[in-house]
From Swiss-Prot:
Lineage, highest ranks first: Eukaryota, Metazoa, Spiralia, Lophotrochozoa, Mollusca
Gene Ontology biological-process entries: aerobic respiration
Role description: Core subunit of the mitochondrial membrane respiratory chain NADH dehydrogenase (Complex I) that is believed to belong to the minimal assembly required for catalysis. Complex I functions in the transfer of electrons from NADH to the respiratory chain. The immediate electron acceptor for the enzyme is believed to be ubiquinone.
Protein known as: NADH-ubiquinone oxidoreductase chain 1
Source species: Pecten maximus (King scallop)
Bilayer-crossing regions: 43-63, 108-128, 139-159, 180-200, 211-231, 264-284, 298-318, 334-354
Length: 354
């Protein structure tokens, strides 16, 4: 399949016969109703929010490369723009302008839908917007929403690995499935602790409950285990067995290039950013640490929430530069034989205390 990935995707999108009707309905000025204005405004703010997320993901990659370069006593990317500030955009243009190639033995439709599913899943995760600015889009069942969406993320990895019809990709997908199932049990136990303490599934209630500091001490004890679980769930070093280069060449995405690889890359780093933000809300107070945003203002809440998210991201990147890759069988033995029995006992004791 020739042509660039971007051109191929645009051709498929524009071939849909009904797209221009929606465009006319949104942009027409005849009989402009309040409902249409609300739809246009919601669409504008949603697109603006996701543009901010994409920009954050782009500069997260640059930040990681700079930290890894500093840990290895080298300069890192600095050729494109001032101090390499335009490097993420150069990488994105390079990837999306390359030829979109489909392996001959693969399933073309599922091969294309795999990265799309991963990117869509990462965007749906941000639908709850858990307090990155202290005034996110909260709702009462936000905690259950995040847990439900997080649990289906592995399907994109399995879809990419299976549709590639490659042994390396399939082994990476099977590893991802086993690892996520194993550590999702631990994730659920740790994730529910803040909600049991507060007595609500609202993320804002969890964030505001830590303002007084009465719950912060209890939840802070859970934080190291949670960070450990986040590293395993997001396939980050030292638990990046899904993309084990020394064993699986590149894991489940070995057959992907151009825009497909870029979409997988964006989805993975978007999930890292989301989990960092979720960590700051559940265990560090997020943007509400100094009180409600109405007292300190939106800007101060934004700075505080972003600072805590940045610190968690920095810790994740620092783990990659500091620790070697763990062994896969030892990782499985660690969770099932050591961590999970201790964690279940502590969780039962925690429920009796509260």
């Amino acid at each position: 399949m020739g042509g660039s990935f971007l051109q191929s995707w645009l051709n498929k999108a524009l071939s849909w016969p009904g797209w221009y009707k929606w465009y006319w309905w949104l942009t027409s000025t005849k009989s402009l109703s309040i409902g249409r204005l609300v739809c246009v405004e919601a669409l504008f703010w949603s697109l603006s929010f996701y543009v901010v997320v994409l920009l954050s993901v782009a500069y997260l990659t640059l930040f990681e490369r700079k930290v890894l370069a500093a840990s290895q006593v080298r300069k890192g990317p600095e050729m494109v723009g001032w101090l390499g500030i335009m490097q993420p955009f150069a990488d994105g243009i390079k990837l999306f302008s390359k030829e979109y190639f489909t392996p001959s033995n693969s399933n073309p439709a599922l091969f294309f839908l795999g990265p799309c599913f991963m990117l869509l899943h990462s965007f749906i995760l941000w639908g709850c917007s858990p307090g990155i600015w202290g005034c996110g889009v909260y709702f009462f069942w936000g905690g259950l929403y995040v847990l439900s969406v997080l649990s289906v993320g592995v399907y994109g990895v399995v879809l990419c690995g299976w549709s590639s019809n490659s042994r390396y990709a399939m082994f990476g997908a099977v590893r991802a499935l086993a690892q996520v199932i194993s550590y999702e049990v631990m994730l659920v136990f740790l994730y529910l602790c803040p909600f049991f303490v507060v007595g609500s599934l609202d993320l804002e209630s969890v964030s505001l409950s830590q303002v007084s500091g009465c719950n912060g001490g209890v939840l802070f004890l859970v934080l190291p285990w949670w960070v450990f679980c986040v590293l395993a769930e997001s396939n980050r070093a030292p638990f990046d067995f899904v993309e084990g280069e020394s064993e699986l060449v590149s894991g489940f995405n070995v057959e992907y290039g151009s825009g497909g690889f870029a979409m997988i890359f964006i989805a993975e780093y978007s999930n890292i950013l989301f989990l960092s933000t979720l960590t700051s809300v559940l265990f560090l107070g997020g943007g509400n640490l100094l009180g409600n945003g109405e007292y300190f203002g939106l800007i101060s809440s934004s700075v505080i929430g972003s600072f805590f998210s940045f610190m968690v991201v920095f810790l994740i990147v620092l783990c990659r530069s500091s620790f070697p890759r763990y062994r896969y069988d030892m990782l499985m033995k660690l969770i099932w034989c050591q961590i999970l029995p201790i964690l279940m006992s502590c969780f039962a004791l925690f429920l009796m205390i509260i």
